[in-house]
Amino acid sequence: MRFLTKFFAPVLALVAIFACGPAVFAQAAESGGRVVLVLPFNNHSGDASLNWIGDSFPDTLNKRLTSAGFLTISHDDRQFAYDHLGLPTDFRPTRATTIRIAEQLDANYVILGSYSVVPGPGGTAGSGGGAANSKITIQAKVLSIDALRMSAPINDSAELMRLFDAENAIAWKIAGVMDPHFSASEQTFLGASDAVPLPAFEDYIRGINANGDERLKRLKNAVSQAPNYPGALLELGKEQYAERDFDAAATTLAKVPKTDRLALEANFYLGLAEFNSANYAGAQAAFKFVASRLPLPEVVNNEAVAVSRQGKDSVDLFRKASDADPSDEDYHYNLAIAMFRRGDTAGATREVDAALKLKASDNEAGELLAQLKKVPAGTKLNADKDNGFSPLERIRRNYSETGFRQAAFQLEQVRATRLAMLPADQRATEYTQLGREYLSEGLLPEAETQFQDALKASPNSADAHAGMAQLREASGDPNGARDEAKTSLIMKPNVVALLVLARLDLADKKLGESAQEITQALQLDPKNASAIALKLVVQQRGQTVR
């Protein structure tokens, strides 16, 4: 029961931080049953050089199923289960073993599958001569652990060069099998594909499944082919950090966009890399970014340590970490040191006592308590390196992907439950705003879910229809985008819908119609930057815009 139970206390702490009522959290906690384990797919091609494709399915399906509201199990946790059961990394489990693995990880569903690749003319599927025309055929099944029932086969196929589309299509079908109420469009899933060249994706997948020099080489190759590839940047930065090349790690990790879902993990390791390079201000900034979005106690603690290393007071941050997880003796120890630096000897004594109650064998805490007993009340800590007493706050160096993702998942559940209690119009407004935020981050399936929820709450919401129009445009569905924009404008004139139509008409070379829509948008909002920029584009093509 490792997966769901280990991080329950920090999640409760997060609920307290966001001031959600216990009833809201209880309802969210009861909406479980969405934990998914994706296993590597079996290669039926007879070509071992294509095994990497099987390893790629957990990576892609985890991303897409997470966007559909499922909690997917990471590569590291899957490996933990294999190690715990004494299974090799490349083990292909039977159904009985699969169930044992799923039970070890508290999974409700397991995704299993296979694929075959038919080479195109001119070479094998894995060679440059035939890869472009090779075809991949995929079959997946969903094993429900709760019902002990296997689904019917789920099939898809595509040219091998369109592997992302094939994997996303399979993910969309799988989501529908696990959740009959799942309503995101397939086109939205296809539009969410990473714009990564297939060779870079191959190097990335081979890299994350390799060790040592081979791992580093593959990840560097992936980044050299796709310099803005967030997944490859994260894994390369983590590998550089593990190799203690902290400057290189910091440079690499800083390139992961702040809007990407991987930014939290990237900035956690960026903070550690900066900390180990004694760039404490940089470390503070990185940890602060993570804490602002997911204030787990280990992140707040690390931010506090970075602040303290700069000679600044960090009591409030350490107290926040300790309050969030009072069972962690390190947080009490750190708070005790910070209080001692401030001159609060009574508070420091209280906190170090709490640390020793949790771990009586902590020699550093025992020494700190002894020093506190020697000094007068109100004395400020002045590290005495001559006699060896120079206590330092402890930083957390391990990022738990499971803990972070579990906390983020539960917060989403809490937020959804809170929104469900609002009046319909207010609910629609908040869902629409969330949809726009997701859309701005390129998270198309997540955005569609929010816009759909907004329209369920208020079917006549012009803003929600306008948001859906933007989504359809972004996912490559111009007809759907046009329909949604027109529907939005029937309900209320608005700039967003008008600009969607203007861009669509511009793409169709209907410059007159595009100009009219831009004019209407500027009448509603004369200073709208997007409308002004689009006006210049249309004018440069010889069309007058009034």
Residue map of PLM features:
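Start-of-helix register in tetratricopeptide repeats
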Residues: 201, 231, 265, 298-299, ...
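Short beta-strand->alpha-helix linker/helix-N-cap micro-motif
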Residues: 28-100, 104-129, 145-153, 189-196
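C-terminal/domain-edge helix-coil "capping" segments
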Residues: 26-34, 59, 68-71, 97, ...
